[in-house]
Structure formats: structure tokens, C-alpha cells
């Protein structure tokens, strides 16, 4: 079979498969490249969701109860319990968190 004969016989299938591949690549790039605009914070010893709400709720324009509910839902915390060393996503945009932290620490300090 020559390429011309294969093309003439299966051109619809070839175009369909190539279209699916291209759309799949676009979808993967969109999902992977999109990322989250929300900040991720590490939980310290003695922290709770309510302590995080006290610290960050003002930057998120949410009431503290709404803040805690959002964090529980987005981080799949059914009982609302977090432990030191956990990392949780909070409803504060990364740009807001970066703007409020105006101090710069050098690597050797």
C-alpha cells in the first residue's frame, strides 16, 4: 500500500485522530499550566483553621466562618483538623499575599 492509497482510504480517520491528539494536548496544557491563583500556606504548631482565618481572612474579603468553610472544602478536610507541617490552600490570591509581605530575606540570613 502506498501512502496515497492509505490517505485516500482513511483520510477521515487520520484527520479525526490528529484532531483528537491536538485537542488533548491543548487540554493538558490548559489544566497543567493553569494552576491555582490562591496561596498555599504551611500550618505551624498550634495553628488551626480559625487561627489561619484570623490571620488571612482580611486579605480574602471573606467572613471568618466562610473562610474556614472554603478551606475545609478545597482541602478535603472533613473534620476541619490540620496538623503542623500540613500545607493548605487558602482563599487569598497570591498577588495579595505577596504585596502584603514587603520584607525580603536574603538566603544567607
Swiss-Prot record:
Its main location: cytoplasm. Keywords: Cell cycle, Cell division, Cytoplasm, DNA damage, DNA repair, Septation, SOS response. One of its GO terms (biological process) is negative regulation of cell division. InterPro entries: Cell_div_suppressor_YneA, LysM_dom, LysM_dom_sf. One of its GO terms (cellular component) is cytoplasm. It comes from the Bacteria. The keyword NADP does not apply. Residues 39-90 form the LysM domain. PROSITE patterns: LYSM (PS51782). It is found in: Cytoplasm. Pfam families: LysM. The keyword Phosphoprotein does not apply. Inhibits cell division during the SOS response. Affects a later stage of the cell division protein assembly, after the assembly of the Z ring, by probably suppressing recruitment of FtsL and/or DivIC to the division machinery. HAMAP family: YneA. Belongs to the YneA family. This is Cell division suppressor protein YneA. It comes from Listeria monocytogenes serovar 1/2a (strain ATCC BAA-679 / EGD-e). The lineage of its organism: Bacteria, Bacillati, Bacillota, Bacilli, Bacillales.
Amino acid at each position: 500500500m502506498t501512502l496515497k492509497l492509505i490517505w485516500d482510504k482513511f483520510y477521515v480517520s487520520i484527520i479525526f485522530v490528529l484532531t483528537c491528539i491536538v485537542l488533548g494536548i491543548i487540554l493538558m496544557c490548559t489544566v497543567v499550566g493553569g494552576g491555582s491563583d490562591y496561596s498555599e500556606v504551611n500550618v505551624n504548631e498550634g495553628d488551626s483553621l480559625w487561627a489561619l482565618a484570623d490571620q488571612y481572612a482580611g486579605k480574602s474579603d471573606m467572613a471568618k466562618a466562610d473562610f474556614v468553610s472554603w478551606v475545609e472544602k478545597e482541602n478535603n478536610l472533613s473534620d476541619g483538623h490540620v496538623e503542623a507541617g500540613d500545607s493548605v490552600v487558602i482563599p487569598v490570591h497570591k498577588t495579595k499575599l505577596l504585596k502584603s509581605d514587603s520584607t525580603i530575606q536574603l538566603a544567607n540570613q
